[in-house]
Amino acid sequence: MGYRVVVAGATGNVGREMLNILAEREFPADEVAALASRRSLGTEVSYGDKTLVTKDLDTFDFSGWDIALFAVGSEATQKYAPKAAAAGCVVIDNSSLYRYDPDVPLVVPEVNADAVLGYSKKNIIANPNCSTAQMVVALKPLHDRVPIKRVVVSTYQSVSGAGKQGMDELWDQTKAIYNPTDDKRPEKFTKQIAFNVIPHIDKFMDDGSTKEEWKMVAETKKIVDTRIKVTATCVRVPVFVGHSESINIEFEDFLDEDEARDILREAPGVMVIDKREDGGYVTPVEAAGDYATFISRIRQDSTIDNGINLWCCLLYTSPSPRDATLSRMPSSA
């Protein structure tokens, strides 16, 4: 017997991708309902070879439904997720609302799949921030071999992380560079994104870090190990899809780069492409269309006794099928 599945936010990029992946993976769903806000009521969305007509999230009765995939913002999640959970539907939430709630598991399947068993406290499972998700997939297998002491990460995050408006702004500004009659001032981003990089994602905190950077610290501790020290610098780059990260890892004891490479080759959700030659690494272009976290440039850090440097890339399309959808297929729930 299959599940009855709800996708809330079905007309957005993430919601549509959820429906695509549910169909592609042949998830055992007997029935799928597509929900949207009142202004999108009646919109048609694709689910495999079927067409679903969206229903009103505000009036939907979650009773008798098994799983609700929430691809709406924190405000809507706060209003509707408790309603769904109280009706007995397991909510799997993409927003940041429940990530730091001690009674809600924060799950990356390749890293802490067992944590999903804690969903019953509130009937809610949270999904981490995109930049955290790809990093912990790389960190966890290494941490299991030799405990990690400290992580320094710099991100190169595509405009898809800012949604369709961010992608449109990059496209429009790029065209405007070559057509001076077009005046495309920044709207979604605080500064020009075309042919530029912006060291600012989300709002600024009192200590000078941004909320995106704070998320990476807090979520890594919750998912992997509270004892790991993490410092992050998150940067928006003029790439349409695909997030990348430069990660420096300091271990408690020595870990050889060859052993680290072997560990990562065997790790779930990881694809190692690491040749010390021109083109022997992965960029966001190559990562597009695949659900793996690609890792390259694995090498010792000669400035500390127990350090490793690496580069990782992950497809991300607001968010990627892997982050936003695959981690929402709760086989244990």
Q: Where are the language model's segments positioned?
A:
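A glycine-rich, Thr/Ser-enriched phosphate-binding loop motif common to dinucleotide/cofactor-binding enzymes
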Residues: 123-134, 208-217, 322
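Helix N-cap motif at beta-to-alpha junctions
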Residues: 251-254
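A common structural junction motif
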Residues: 259, 264-273
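Hydrophobic alpha-helical segments, chiefly the membrane-spanning helices
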Residues: 327-333
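N-terminal Rossmann-like NAD(P) cofactor-binding subdomain of oxidoreductases
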Residues: 1-193, 229, 262, 276-304, ...
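Oxyanion-binding "anion nests"
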Residues: 197-234
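Conserved small/polar residues in nucleotide/adenosyl-binding loops
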Residues: 316-321
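Conserved glycine-rich beta-strand-loop-beta hairpin in the small C-terminal domain of fold type I
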Residues: 241-246
